[in-house]
Amino acid sequence: MKDLRFVLQRLVDAPALTQLPRYADYSLEVGEEILSAAGRFAADVLDPLNAPGDREGARIGASGVTLPSAFHAAYEQFIAGGWPQLAADADIGGQGAPLVIATAV
């Protein structure tokens, strides 16, 4: 998180984004909360999939690509958590987060 904070504050100048009307509801603290939540999701949900994913592997066959069975529940949690729509406009169901935050996630 320390490295991401440095990048957001010093390289990207994320605090300047909050001066734009589009991101008036965002602050560096909100961005850090989003990144922390994404980190918890990665540690709690995605990281445990590494070993089963390596054992089962992805397969391609006549019916398409088959992923390891544990991946499906993780994907559903990813969708339910709203992660894919993080930077999308609120008027289409997104969260309106700055793209730099969504990209870091």
Mark where each language-model region is.
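Amphipathic, small/basic residue-rich leader segments at the start of a protein or domain
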Residues: 1-104
